[in-house]
Amino acid sequence: NIKTYGVGDHKHIAEINQEIKKASKMNNSEVFFSANLIPVERGILSNIYVNPIKGTSFDEVYSCLYNAYKSEKYINILDQNEIPITKDVVNTNKVILGLKKGYKEDVYCIVSVLDNLLKGAAGQAMQNFNIMNKFNESLGID
């Protein structure tokens, strides 16, 4: 059974919009967000639809995504138009991102998967603690 919740009023929407505005430096950027509950023990899959600035190519968007995360230990970027699946992140502290081009030239989909019990909770807390205390980022995680 699959259930959608938080349509238009999800508890994290204010935080998501706040961080998008900071990252994009565009005050008119906003997200409409809802979540889906599925019967799995671990894993979150997010579909994030983006409308890039007019004239920005798919390759430019992919390069931006790739360059932003290429040096991050726990974030993997798939090749263009490849889509991640949740089974590839179960029991890991990693996030896998894919960027897919659809039939419309001005809409792309970023697909993100992570293990909500590691990267989404305990693993992320350990990673943040390590970084804040200038320890090796992966101490106690790997």
State each model region's role.
Residues 94-97, 101-142:
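NAD(P)-dependent Rossmann-like dehydrogenase/reductase catalytic/cofactor-binding core
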Residues 1-110:
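C-terminal substrate-binding/catalytic lobe of Rossmann-fold NAD(P)-dependent oxidoreductases
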